[in-house]
Amino acid sequence: MGVEIETISPGDGRTFPKKGQICVVHYTGMLQNGKKFDSSRDRNKPFKFRIGKQEVIKGFEEGTAQMSLGQRAKLTCTPDVAYGATGHPGVIPPNATLIFDVELLSLE
């Protein structure tokens, strides 16, 4: 349970997000069956969120916080750190495990 991180391509191995910093990422979110539900890449606009402010689901934040600058990783988030039993009506079914392809582009 929680978030599992699998590196796709390594980052610098030194620069990690700190609480209060803004992470600038590109991501694609998918259900376990591979169905894409969201992608900053498709919009061609990086997504920003602040670490420690609960602006994203817990698994996304916990996973990104363990990535180093420039890293691209697959984050597998179990329902307890995603949308849980409620899901996100019309988009995420209840008790769904979510998979994100995340690239940490920069920190602000």
Curated annotation (Swiss-Prot):
InterPro entries reported for this sequence? FKBP-type_PPIase, PPIase_dom_sf, PPIase_FKBP_dom
Where does the PPIase FKBP-type domain lie? Answer: 20-108
The record, for PROSITE patterns, names: FKBP_PPIASE
Which family is annotated?
Belongs to the FKBP-type PPIase family. FKBP1 subfamily.
Q: What is its EC number?
A: 5.2.1.8
Instruction: State the source organism's domain of life.
Output: Eukaryota
Q: Name one Pfam family in it.
A: FKBP_C
Instruction: Give the taxonomic lineage as stored in the record.
Output: Eukaryota, Metazoa, Chordata, Craniata, Vertebrata
Which key words tag this protein in UniProt? Cytoplasm, Isomerase, Rotamase, Sarcoplasmic reticulum
Query: Which is one GO molecular function term here?
Result: FK506 binding
Q: Subunit composition?
A: Identified in a complex composed of RYR2, FKBP1B, PKA catalytic subunit, PRKAR2A, AKAP6, and the protein phosphatases PP2A and PP1. Interacts directly with RYR2.
Q: Per the entry, what modulates this protein's activity? A: Inhibited by both FK506 and rapamycin.
State the name under which the record lists this protein: Peptidyl-prolyl cis-trans isomerase FKBP1B
Q: Which residues cross the membrane?
A: none
Instruction: Look at the named UniProt entry and state the broad enzyme category this protein falls under.
Output: isomerase
